């Protein structure tokens, strides 16, 4: 079940697509906040991989809405590479600094004003609440 709010007769297809991208960032932000609250550890950086990392708008919005830096590696899919490096580090073939120091990354830093971030996030929470209470 889902909900689209704030649509009018003039809402364009691109705005709906952007809303879908925004939802990815909001959901990840919800998870990051829950992890931080449960662990008591502030999360200041996300290291991400996968297909959505190609979308610069999404990566910047993720950084803005979660108020953390987002690090995107030059390699798109790192799950397999990460497993291989972890095994190599555990076996003493690689050292941690050698592996992680070599990876080039694009960094996205939060640029959104705090009041705008809070307004957008509260709008997200209200939309989620609407779905949950219907």
Question: Which residues make up each language-model segment?
Answer:
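Glycine/Thr-rich phosphate-binding loops that ligate phosphate moieties of nucleotide
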Residues: 1-134
């Amino acid at each position: 079940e889902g909900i689209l709010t704030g649509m009018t007769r003039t809402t364009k297809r691109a705005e709906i697509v952007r809303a879908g991208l925004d939802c990815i960032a909001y959901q990840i932000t919800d998870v990051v906040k829950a992890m931080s609250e449960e662990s008591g550890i502030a999360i200041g950086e996300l290291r991400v991989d996968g297909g959505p990392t190609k979308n610069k708008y999404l990566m910047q919005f993720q950084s803005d809405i979660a108020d953390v830096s987002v690090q995107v590696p030059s390699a798109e899919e790192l799950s397999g590479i990460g497993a291989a490096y972890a095994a190599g580090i555990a076996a003493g073939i690689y050292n941690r600094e050698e592996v992680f120091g070599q990876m080039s990354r694009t960094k996205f830093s939060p640029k959104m004003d705090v009041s705008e971030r809070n307004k957008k996030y509260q709008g997200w929470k209200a939309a989620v609440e609407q779905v949950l209470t219907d």
